[in-house]
Curated annotation (Swiss-Prot):
Residues 44-101 bind DNA. It comes from the Eukaryota. GO terms for molecular function: DNA binding; DNA-binding transcription factor activity. This is Ethylene-responsive transcription factor ERF023. InterPro entries: AP2/ERF_dom (IPR001471), AP2/ERF_dom_sf (IPR036955), AP2/ERF_TF_ERF_subfamily (IPR051032), DNA-bd_dom_sf (IPR016177). Residues 11-24 have a biased composition (Polar residues). Its main location: nucleus. Keywords: Activator, DNA-binding, Ethylene signaling pathway, Nucleus, Transcription, Transcription regulation. Probably acts as a transcriptional activator. Binds to the GCC-box pathogenesis-related promoter element. May be involved in the regulation of gene expression by stress factors and by components of stress signal transduction pathways.
Length: 192
């Protein structure tokens, strides 16, 4: 493949998606050296970085101090970004660079600007973000309130009694399902 063709295959950048530029990463990284944290930093959200094992973490440096306030470890970057916004607004006020400036009035406020109160308010903000499960370990962004599984029904399985047994849960190798608030055991049938 020619270098020109490789350049064209990169994803397009749209005007409504903020992206990190080389100068922004350089100014945050301190000097021109690339550190391990600059390669794990989220390209859009301030104060958010990704751990090697996939969790997103957030922390903020206290103004005029070398110490940092740990805000937490989260499954999605949006949760970490909300936690950062609460802390940044408390510590820096209206001058803070926020990830979601239009939502700052709706976020919880710490009672004081002590690290402990900031951590509590940041945790509340992060936990208010709804996430959608995409697979076993994958999560995707913010939930818009629609539940994917709401519209899926298996009437043949439920009506014919094909393995569905409303017995109380007994610990074992069988999978468990929560149906209408009650815990039922689903016994797998050999289909082969």
């Amino acid at each position: 493949m020619s270098p020109q063709r490789m350049k064209l295959s990169s994803p397009p950048v749209t005007n409504n998606e903020p992206t990190a530029t080389a100068s922004a990463v350089k100014s945050c990284g301190g000097g021109g050296k690339e550190t391990s944290s600059s390669t794990t930093r989220h390209p859009v959200y301030h104060g958010v970085r990704k751990r090697r094992w996939g969790k997103w973490v957030s922390e903020i440096r206290e103004p005029r101090k070398k110490s940092r306030i740990w805000l937490g470890s989260f499954p999605v970057p949006e949760m970490a970004a909300k936690a950062y916004d609460v802390a940044a607004f408390c510590l820096k006020g209206r001058k803070a660079q926020l990830n979601f400036p239009e939502e700052i009035e709706d976020l919880p406020r710490p009672s004081t600007c002590t690290p402990r109160d900031i951590q509590v308010a940041a945790a509340k903000a992060a936990n208010a973000v709804k996430i959608i499960k995409m697979g076993d370990d994958d999560v995707a962004g913010i939930d818009d309130g629609d539940d994917f599984w709401e519209g899926i029904e298996l009437p043949e399985l439920m009506m014919s009694g094909g393995g569905w047994s409303p017995e109380p849960f007994v610990a074992g190798d069988d999978a468990t399902w929560l149906v209408d608030g009650d815990l039922y055991q689903y016994q797998f049938m050999a289909c082969l």
